[in-house]
From Swiss-Prot:
SUPFAM superfamilies: Nucleotide-diphospho-sugar transferases, Trimeric LpxA-like enzymes. It holds the Pfam family LbH_GLGC. The gene is glgC. It catalyses: alpha-D-glucose 1-phosphate + ATP + H(+) = ADP-alpha-D-glucose + diphosphate. This is Glucose-1-phosphate adenylyltransferase. Belongs to the bacterial/plant glucose-1-phosphate adenylyltransferase family. Its EC number is 2.7.7.27. Alpha-D-glucose 1-phosphate binds at residues 162, 177-178, 209. One of its GO terms (molecular function) is ATP binding.
Length: 429
């Protein structure tokens, strides 16, 4: 795998995940209490022995850079690296990244300096565990110019994805972006060609692109340089290249979820608590998911009832009830609180007992969840200060609302409390 260079697409300004992306690049959004989105593709790369990795982001993020430099330091042991490349405006190119392919095009000069055979293009907002060695092996064995990782899907979900058709040898011959009706029916394929059983093939007669590609080095350069107006891999570069290049499909049979929207992100996080066995698990010693070591103390839970939840390290919980929730590092919950179906992202630092006491005396709200509060079906971003007797339950069942000046948004019926927000005592949302 020393001949493979990984390029992780960090996404644009992160509008689909806003307001979680208000103060950070999308790859830096916290996940499952103690990880960040970028940890998923990076861990997959490391477990697959791919150690030359670039991360492309639309704008630079202090928290992303800090996380990567503190977590993924390969110096002294190999020629591996993890480096962030942010969009930049130059005299030759005064524009920001116009799309996924344009992002790679703008930094092609940096990628071409490496002595490698293939580029592995990855997305930064997917939740899955994959050994890229099998994927790249398939690419080499078939002599493909480009190999796409695909997932089999059923008719119900098919119209939400870019679909493709393959011939009897697994070669991609046709594309359709989010087809409906008769056009959808025409995209059915025999997925037994890719290794599914007849029963599985009947259940999932469509194949969708995961947005993960392997390119031969010279093929990617050729496609990007000869087609400067094509800015997106999934919508333009890949469909355009099917005619003249050997495109192969590689079937991925594991769990895979695009978590690039608030609803999908929220549901994928809470699904980690599903019993008896969640579809994705962080408890896998063979293929671990790496993140920064923080050396935090164990969580302290005093007279609490906690069911179907994940609690990260360094939390202080007092006399509260927590159900089907994710608690991030350094979360603090005071007495008589109820937290249900909620993701609390925790805090970046602790407030000392004396500071908390002086804040209370001044009538200010300390960090964490105040006494007697109820939070249901919400995401509370880092360092939020929730006052006493606050109720966050989307009382009026609103689907979408922008209340940024009040410290929250409602997206798809999910209340999202902003990072560093303060919610006053007695507030009802």
């Amino acid at each position: 795998m020393k001949k493979v260079l990984a390029i992780i697409l960090g996404g644009g300004a992160g509008t689909r995940l806003y307001p979680l992306t208000k103060l950070r690049a999308k790859p830096a959004v916290p996940l499952a209490g103690k990880y960040r989105l970028i940890d998923i593709p990076l861990s997959n790369c490391i477990n697959s022995e791919i150690l030359k990795i670039y991360v492309l982001t639309q704008f630079n993020s202090a928290s992303l850079n800090r996380h990567l430099t503190r977590t993924y330091n390969f110096t002294g042991f190999s020629d591996g690296f993890v480096e962030v490349l942010a969009a930049q405006q130059t005299a030759e190119n005064p524009k920001w990244f116009q799309g996924t392919a344009d992002a790679v095009r703008q930094y092609l000069w940096a990628f071409q300096e490496w002595d490698i055979d293939e580029y592995l293009i990855l997305s930064g907002d997917h939740l899955y565990r994959m050994d890229y060695r099998d994927f790249i092996q398939r690419h080499r064995e078939t002599g493909a110019d480009i190999t796409l990782s695909v997932v089999p899907i059923d008719e119900e979900r098919a119209s939400s994805f870019g679909l493709m058709k393959i011939d009897d040898h697994g070669r991609v011959v046709d594309f359709s972006e989010k087809p409906k009706g008769d056009e959808l029916k025409q995209m059915q394929v025999d997925t037994t060609v890719l290794g599914l059983t007849p029963e599985q093939a009947k259940e999932s007669p469509y194949i969708a692109s995961m947005g993960i590609y392997v390119f031969k080095k010279e093929v990617l350069a050729q496609l990007l340089e000869e087609n400067p107006d094509q800015t997106d891999f999934g919508k333009e570069i890949i469909p355009f290249s099917a005619k003249d290049y050997n495109l192969q499909a590689y079937l991925f049979k594991g769990y895979w979820e695009d978590i690039g929207t608030i609803k999908a992100f929220y549901e994928a996080n809470l699904a980690l608590n599903r019993q008896p066995s969640p579809r994705f698990s962080f408890y896998n010693e063979e293929y671990p998911i790496y993140t920064r070591s923080r050396y935090l103390p164990p969580t302290k839970a005093l007279n609490c009832t906690i069911t179907e939840s994940m609690v990260s390290e360094g939390c202080i919980l007092k006399d509260c009830r927590i159900h089907n929730s994710i608690l991030g590092i350094r979360t603090r919950i005071e007495a008589n609180c109820t937290i249900e179906d909620t993701m609390l992202m925790g805090a970046d630092y602790y407030e000392s007992p004396s500071l908390r006491e002086s804040k209370a005396q001044e009538g200010k709200i300390p960090m964490g969840i105040g006494e007697g509060s109820t939070i249901r079906r919400a995401i509370v971003d880092k360092n939020a200060r929730i006052g006493r007797n606050v109720t966050i339950v989307n009382k009026e069942n609103i689907d979408e609302s922008n209340q940024e000046e009040s410290g929250f948004y409602i997206r798809n019926g999910i209340v999202v409390i902003l990072k560093n927000a303060t919610i006053a005592d007695g507030t009802v949302i």
